[in-house]
Amino acid sequence: MSELFSTPDHTLDALGLRCPEPVMMVRKTVRTMPVGETLLIIADDPATTRDIPGFCRFMEHELVAQETEALPYRYLIRKSH
């Protein structure tokens, strides 16, 4: 799965940020991305394990991959629309 994280179109470093900042930054970044591009989010807030997948479901973007077994957490999302 780690290979999926090696070539994102965009990267967002949310290390040290706490809820709701990471999701707010993801939303702002995704808005500027063309459809189909990917965003790698790197975070250490435990709330992101719930918030990032929830954001993807609510906004109908694809959660391509996630690694949350150890810090830092990594999420790869693809903009769907």
Curated annotation (Swiss-Prot):
Pathway: tRNA modification. It is found in: Cytoplasm. GO terms for biological process: tRNA wobble position uridine thiolation. Pfam families: TusA. Its main location: cytoplasm. Keywords: Cytoplasm, tRNA processing. Sulfur carrier protein involved in sulfur trafficking in the cell. Part of a sulfur-relay system required for 2-thiolation during synthesis of 2-thiouridine of the modified wobble base 5-methylaminomethyl-2-thiouridine (mnm(5)s(2)U) in tRNA. Interacts with IscS and stimulates its cysteine desulfurase activity. Accepts an activated sulfur from IscS, which is then transferred to TusD, and thus determines the direction of sulfur flow from IscS to 2-thiouridine formation. Also appears to be involved in sulfur transfer for the biosynthesis of molybdopterin. This is Sulfur carrier protein TusA.
